[in-house]
Amino acid sequence: MKMIIDGKKVDSLSGETFDVINPATGKVIESVPKATAEDIELAVTAAVKGQKEWAKTSVTQRADILHRFVEIVEQNKEMLAQTLCAENGKPITEARAEIGNISIAFPAFAEHAKHFYGTLIPQGTEAGQETTLQLVTREPIGVVACIIPFNFPCDLYDQKVAPALMMGNAAIVLPSSDNPLTLMKLTDNRKLNIAIIIYQISQKSWCTRQLSIHTCCFGNCKVERHCGLWICSRNGNG
């Protein structure tokens, strides 16, 4: 399989790959590209460009696109569950449930975002603002780096990606190198704006670090302890 950068399926610029192993059998399932720093720069550049156009779409349009994505997931849910079972090692019943959660979470975030309004602060609510009417609007923050751990890749994918997209952000998704295949297949079976979700695959934690210190990437993430400490230390140092 290939990464997706700027709407195109591509190999790593280095040409390097690594194997995804079935933990139950020890056999190779498939080989995937190993991202380089240059790949990440290309992905971020494409995400920044795509986000500007994506942010111009209405919330209703974004919701329609997410609903169409869910239709594709439903049509391919057994294939996705079998892939998740093979690469993650979890029982097929749990894999099917996790794929099913995508069809719950994406519509939920899509509909909630339609009613996620700004705030109007009336006159006189705050001291010194007796004659001032304050309006707070909600704007996209830009590019969000979604770092996905190995244990519940699809659950964490829908909890990170769906709200980011619905609020007009771009999402760069970094799957775990242990099991990236299901999320990559989700990319092949979706109708989201191709410039918005971009996959980076890497065996090394430096890939996470590269994204965490990039000036275009913001947001919250739950990651391995060493990655979290790295992000905090870099952000603390400005």
Please name every model-derived segment:
Residues 1-131:
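N-terminal Rossmann-like NAD(P)+-binding subdomain of aldehyde/semialdehyde dehydrogenases
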Residues 118-238:
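Rossmann-like NAD(P) dinucleotide-binding subdomain of oxidoreductase/dehydrogenase enzymes
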